[in-house]
Amino acid sequence: MTGAQPPQGEAMPIASHLFIVEATVPPGIEEDWNRWYNEVHLPEIGDCPGFLSAQRYVCEDASGRRYVAIYELESPEAIRSAEFAARRGWAQFTGQVEFRSGVFSKIAGYAPTRG
């Protein structure tokens, strides 16, 4: 990803909001989907104003291939920007991928101290 990184030794900001996208991908397009998502889509969405980070995961025990992308946001306004609107969508995969998405607001957090 090409987004800004914190200086060495500093932590990334802790997001108050997450934008989560879950997708079920047919096996016949999975390789092309992953290449496009990892190399094109994730960086272009992650570089939108108000996006702090972007990661993808695959479900280890799913029947069918389920993926999730988790974007940390400064605020829910990030997904309402013109830049995001211009970059969102599934490109050539439109109509082939089942998905759902939502913005989640942080209600609690915990980070263990290690020593």
Regions found by a protein language model. Give the residues of each.
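Macromolecular interaction modules
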Residues: 2-115
